[in-house]
Amino acid sequence: VSLDDLLNFSSNTSKTLNCKGCENNCTIRCYDFGNGRRYFSGNRCEKHFTNGETSKKKGDNIYEIKNKLLFSRTIETKSQHKLNIGIARALNMFEEFPFWHTLFTECGLNVIISDDSNFSEYEKYVRMVMSDNICFPAKLTHSHIANLQNKKVDRIFMPFVIYEKGENNEQNSYNCPIVTAYSTVIGSVQASDIPLDTPTISFRNRETLLKQCLDYLTSLGIKKDIIEKAFLKAEAEHAR
């Protein structure tokens, strides 16, 4: 039997499908080999059209896990300090909230974080955005600041973080300029009677970071020895 005969004998068929699994609307090519086996091509993920075996166990949602690790923290202060520090659930707080939460609570301050993002709140405050081509996370920050203002916190903490913590011996850990300086935009267009604290911070150098934390917290009436102990715990939590 020749190869041409085998190819002509084959009952292979193909058809075009349109995946409705998300807004990408991928065009999928389905090849049916006539023996119960099929092959899909053109898909950008394998959520609905997969060439591998279907797992019996549903995979974990890494974003839900990260969100829980970052923000599911009990607010238990070590004293009866009445100061409520508001922190926006936005921008670099998705990396640094464990550090600041631990530092402040160990110093006896109450940490109040803004609520989860939602589109209706975003639309309500998007008019405050100064530039249309700014990134979406920055645009979203305005609704989180408004949320903290509505919670009537005593102060809003939005540090001017120039350098992030270095990893893997890279030469530079310079922060995104928008993330670094967006507090200046907030202060210009969203000012209120609630103070906006924007201390300069660098996570690249431990000694510098400790001094910056001491400068800020002593201005709030926290004693140096308490800050130093809290700093050690905040470091450990940030590295965990």
Model region roles, listed by residue range:
Residues V1-R240:
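An N-terminal assembly and electron-transfer interface module characteristic of large anaerobic redox
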